[in-house]
Amino acid sequence: MAANGAECEQPQKRLGPKDKQNGSSTDSSLRERKQLDREERLSLVLWKRPFITLQYFFLETAITLKEWTWKLWQRRGVVFLTVVLFSLFSLAYSIEGAHQEYVQHLEKKFLWCAYWVGLGILSSVGLGTGLHTFLLYLGPHIASVTLAAYECGSVNFPEPPYPAQIVCPEDEALQESISLWTIMSKVRLEACMWGAGTAIGELPPYFMARAARMSGADPDDEDYEEFEEMLEHSQSAQDFASRAKLAVQNMVQKVGFFGILACASIPNPLFDLAGITCGHFLIPFWTFFGATLIGKAIIKMHIQKLFVIITFSKHIVEQMVSLIGVIPGVGASLQKPFREYLEAQRTKLHNPAGDGAAAGESWLSWVFEKVVLVMVCYFILSIINSMAQSYAKRLQQKKYSEEKTK
């Protein structure tokens, strides 16, 4: 019987290599086809194929709105409760009374927090633009508060116009000794809200990988496919980038909460991989989000905030401007606009709006405003491109499913 069993197994062993060869060739052809489809999707941008891109963008927008409408209808009880609460808040907001002072205070704080949370989400999600709202919004805001604190000798800026505009307090009795901790306390709320927004923006990779692992379906996401390939070839990783990604994956998988906390606390471009890793290995949601929130909104934000405040302290800025003047040949011409900009900022701090002594616009501030405008426009364009590419992916997936059913 053993001999007969061996004879029965022999033909299977002979067919094994052919099956493997056929399977590997099928996998390679499928991989090549997916790569070609991905390249075709990436070519779908406004500056190359404007009409098709806009058409796909509007179609994807319609599909997304339809999906969200259906989801809201499925949760109509929660939606109804939300509408009732919103109506009650609107009623309290519109009725005159002694409570209006508290309502206006809560409204101001809520809108201020929502603004920074939204910027944090945009910075974390980015939609492929590399839009980092810390460099464009939060960093300059902290720098402005730091420069104003040293110039005014106080952080008790009049509200209004703060935070829309920073003006020194007229009452000299409000002046105090400025310390690092004083400035950090002044900008703590907006910094923590921005950090919380970046933590919320890390959730999509986590949920995508978790859903793919639990359902066993292929999400056709480039980052997730790269993650799976990295796991398959983890033993043969040679280059520095692959080893760094594997180190992050091992830390998150083995250390758990504190590994995620360490990755979230240190500025690094590989944290998206931590979200995918946590989702793939089914790490509990609150373990992932709790560690991410503490790391990004508290630890990392205090590191970044401290760096900006120290960099823009009065004596550091003055030394930097003086060093610019030392550059041979062009030092004096480069130093002049920086000195004019700092002088204009000091004048603006001591001249509230409407005093008539408005300082002339510095070309540095003009350039910065135009850079921000260009970044925002590029972000909007990239949203259109991204949604058009999502619709193209829908068409390709539909084509795959039709071919499988034939």
Curated annotation (Swiss-Prot):
Q: Where is this region: VTT domain?
A: 173-316
Q: What is the lineage of its organism?
A: Eukaryota, Metazoa, Chordata, Craniata, Vertebrata
Keyword Transit peptide tagged: no
What domain notes does the record hold? Answer: The VTT domain was previously called the SNARE-assoc domain. As there is no evidence that this domain associates with SNARE proteins, it was renamed as VMP1, TMEM41, and TVP38 (VTT) domain.
Report which gene this protein is encoded by: vmp1
Write down what this protein is called. Vacuole membrane protein 1
**Which topology term describes how it sits in the membrane?**
Multi-pass membrane protein
Q: Which reaction does it catalyse?
A: a 1,2-diacyl-sn-glycero-3-phospho-L-serine(in) = a 1,2-diacyl-sn-glycero-3-phospho-L-serine(out); cholesterol(in) = cholesterol(out); a 1,2-diacyl-sn-glycero-3-phosphocholine(in) = a 1,2-diacyl-sn-glycero-3-phosphocholine(out); a 1,2-diacyl-sn-glycero-3-phosphoethanolamine(in) = a 1,2-diacyl-sn-glycero-3-phosphoethanolamine(out)
State where composition is biased (Basic and acidic residues): 10-21
Keyword Endoplasmic reticulum annotated: yes
> In which compartments does the protein localize?
Endoplasmic reticulum-Golgi intermediate compartment membrane; Cell membrane; Vacuole membrane; Endoplasmic reticulum membrane
Superkingdom: Eukaryota
Q: Where is this region: Disordered?
A: 1-34
Which Gene Ontology BP annotations are present? Answer: autophagosome assembly; autophagy; Golgi organization; lipoprotein transport
What exactly does this protein do?
A: Phospholipid scramblase involved in lipid homeostasis and membrane dynamics processes. Has phospholipid scramblase activity toward cholesterol and phosphatidylserine, as well as phosphatidylethanolamine and phosphatidylcholine. Required for autophagosome formation: participates in early stages of autophagosome biogenesis at the endoplasmic reticulum (ER) membrane by reequilibrating the leaflets of the ER as lipids are extracted by atg2 (atg2a or atg2b) to mediate autophagosome assembly.
Residues in compartment: Extracellular:
99-109, 272-273, 328-363
Supply one GO CC term from the record: vacuolar membrane
